Amino acid sequence: MGKSLVIVESPAKAKTINKYLGSQYVVKSSIGHIRDLPTSGSSSSKEPAAKGRKSASEAPALSPKEKARRQLVSRMGVDPEHGWKAKYEILPGKEKVIDELRRLAKDADTVYLATDLDREGEAIAWHLREAIGGDESRYKRVVFNEITKKAIQEAFSQPGELDINRVNAQQARRFLDRVVGYMVSPLLWQKIARGLSAGRVQSVAVKLVVEREREIRAFVPEEYWEVHADLGTAKGANVRFEVTREKGEAFKPLNEAQAMAALEKLKASAYSVAKREDRPTSSRPSAPFITSTLQQAASNRLGFGVKKTMMMAQRLYEAGYITYMRTDSTNLSADAIGMVRGFIEDEFGQKYLPGKANVYSSKEGAQEAHEAIRPSDVNLKPTQLSGMERDAERLYDLIWRQFVACQMTPAEYLSTSVSVTAGDFELRAKGRILKFDGYTRVLPQQSKPGEDDVLPEMKEGENLKLIKLDPSQHFTKPPARYSEASLVKELEKRGIGRPSTYAAIISTIQERGYVTTHNRRFYAEKMGDIVTDRLNESFANLMDYGFTAGMEEHLDDVAQGERDWKHLLDEFYGDFKKKLEVAEVSEKGMRANQPTLTNIPCRECGRPMMIRTASTGVFLGCSGYSLPPKERCKATVNLIPGDEIAADDEGESESRVLRGKHRCPICSTAMDAYLLDEKHKLHICGNNPDCPGYEIEEGQYRIKGYEGPSLECDKCGSEMQLKTGRFGKFFGCTNPTCKNTRKLLKNGEAAPPKMDAIRMPELKCEKVDDIYVLRDGASGMFLAASQFPKNRETRAPLVSEIIPHKAELDPKYHYLCDAPQKDPDGRPAVIRFSRKTKEQYVQSEVDGKPTGWRAFYDGGKWKVEDKR
């Protein structure tokens, strides 16, 4: 009897599983996905010659439309008009992995597909079976919610079959996303700007951020005042009260005058306790984590982004420390409940254990077969993890505490409310005393300011002494900006996306440049605004929240075998294609990205400038750009944002920023400010380009973010000015013939000058007809094609390649010429850059992968480290 082959996605998971299976199993990793639809540039638009096909002279010529359709299908890898025929390709670099798996599978009696238990894991398992091939009856599917000895042995004792319905649900999602992305994005390039993209779920998520941005822009903060009074008791205790009512009505002065008038009356009033109420209250623990609540808690308590949270959770799961981290169910297994109840009783005592297990309801549609996210072994404390980085330990600590707390008794408080009268005014103070800590012994709560104040003894009718009155100005706050965590919460609430897709959605909308983050809050970029509008107009259902959520439910139906996946795709595509054809029409189709004409004269030709928006931001472009070539003017003016970013989202800084903005004279929306130069600021309506409103303000302006003197160009000696580009602020030379730039570092200083590019004619490019030049970048030295950006080939240099050019090198790189040129086996030393230490080192490589031999420059000497 031969051995059985077990295939999982990751080496870490393989290593953990291998501990629990006997020697009759061979556990191998596919290292993630092995097949996919064509990636950019991987699929040729040329059709292979077929046996018996007519020659080119005999074959009927394809119409331009049909030729374009075939090229699109070739790029997409899926044909929506011919039964959704798909062309999957082995991913680059995975050929050796597949060859090894085929070889091992050939000698195996059984092939166990032990990929993750969600739809994506099911799809990976199917792709593995399809790519490896052979008798399908040899393949078995095993799933487990946690990588423990018991769970693994149970899964392998009862293997199942691949669930093709779940595979088809994943394929349907992939095909939908591919069709929308590949067919709408070119339309955006044509109508709005190059380099834009659309996505079935991505664009809807951007719409949420854009709509919130518009709510904020339209919001007009209103002033109001609060008055607090510090009062003293007969026993000398001081208590802070808030003035809440005047003559029975809510007290809310609208300006300083009203607040000061109230202060005069309060100064002349006598203060007496009208009522004291003490009542018991309690606080129940919340449910164990699901994917979305884990992401929110990790953001709020640990400051983790969604992507980092899922990365750390993945490592914990693969090491066997937690259950599967992509779940929407709060369900806990009977074994898990028994384990944690025993732990609570042993660790904290009977009074912390409720009479029966706490049960939490999941949202409708949650997969109850899955469990909530919890520790695999509650007895394993966070400090006892082995081989985990600090951030993974912190996340485990959060998961462990939430799990234990969710099965503990409530925290009990004595809440106190005291009302005081002062003439026509009523004042109120609240506080509470913790009587029994309950679940908070494990999971301390984040209290609101003043919530846990302890009020001293005060009896009804007791007179209090006025110590101080404290008036404070406030402004009403606009809707809060989304953070990564709150956007995930909103997506979940609206039924958009699933636990396995939240992190990808959040990452994608940032990578596409439609939104940016400042102080961990999302801001919609102008291009995100424009694209959202155009997609809303041309693809109303695609951008509709209900439609997107409905599609998720339909995909759930496919996974349950209750709906045919190709019928679902056909229904979507029929309507989508009609809308796309209408949008593509030149006149009545999708609105183009029209510029706004201004009265600002072009510095080169005198024609009026226009406000334009590109994928890189807002700028001024000469109206003469559209003229015939001989008369054309290509002058542009970079616009530097002149607005402050709100310092935080919890306070009133957003309101104060809004109050400082100009309001559009046409539509009253808050305007965005940009610096034209040191004497002119341009205010552009937040609804531009739909609203043409703008204003020019004169004054003396200084660019925020730089407090030092102007710089002298290290190349030509001219002045360098601070500018803002797609990737942030930088210094650019004012000499039009000099293209020198230097980044602005976070500390407000200019980055060190870059080394001039060094031509290396002896080094020929590998993929294009060009030679290499040695360049100096943010990640140290690298080789790049001399005709960049036409040719984009780059690679790391060898030590032996830079030595002949030592005289041309910047002295700061001379030490690299003294590095070892080869490892002990004669492999050449490659110069690499460490993002962690921000320093260059050398290492030997085989097929682009480190051999284990490397050398570091430390203390003026090269030190070799050999881990081969």
UniProtKB/Swiss-Prot annotation:
Zinc finger map (C4-type): 602-633, 664-691, 713-738
Catalysed conversion reaction: ATP-independent breakage of single-stranded DNA, followed by passage and rejoining
Catalytic residues of the enzyme: 324
GO cellular component labels: chromosome
EC number: 5.6.2.1
Record-linked SUPFAM superfamilies: Prokaryotic type I DNA topoisomerase, Zinc beta-ribbon
Listed Gene3D superfamilies: 2.20.25.10, 3.40.50.140, Bacterial Topoisomerase I, domain 1, Topoisomerase I, domain 2, Topoisomerase I, domain 3, Topoisomerase I, domain 4
PROSITE patterns, A to Z: TOPO_IA_1 (PS00396), TOPO_IA_2 (PS52039), TOPRIM (PS50880)
Coiled-coil segments on the chain, per record: none
Binding residues for Mg(2+): 9, 116
Co-factor requirement: Mg(2+)
Gene Ontology molecular function: DNA binding; DNA topoisomerase type I (single strand cut, ATP-independent) activity; zinc ion binding
GO biological process, one term: DNA topological change
Domain Topo IA-type catalytic intervals: 163-580
Sorted UniProt keywords: DNA-binding, Isomerase, Magnesium, Metal-binding, Repeat, Topoisomerase, Zinc, Zinc-finger
Oligomeric form and interacting partners: Monomer.
UniProt function note: Releases the supercoiling and torsional tension of DNA, which is introduced during the DNA replication and transcription, by transiently cleaving and rejoining one strand of the DNA duplex. Introduces a single-strand break via transesterification at a target site in duplex DNA. The scissile phosphodiester is attacked by the catalytic tyrosine of the enzyme, resulting in the formation of a DNA-(5'-phosphotyrosyl)-enzyme intermediate and the expulsion of a 3'-OH DNA strand. The free DNA strand then undergoes passage around the unbroken strand, thus removing DNA supercoils.
NCBIfam families: topA_bact
Protein name as catalogued: DNA topoisomerase 1
Organism: Pseudomonas aeruginosa (strain ATCC 15692 / DSM 22644 / CIP 104116 / JCM 14847 / LMG 12228 / 1C / PRS 101 / PAO1)
Source species taxonomy: Bacteria, Pseudomonadati, Pseudomonadota, Gammaproteobacteria, Pseudomonadales
Gene field: topA
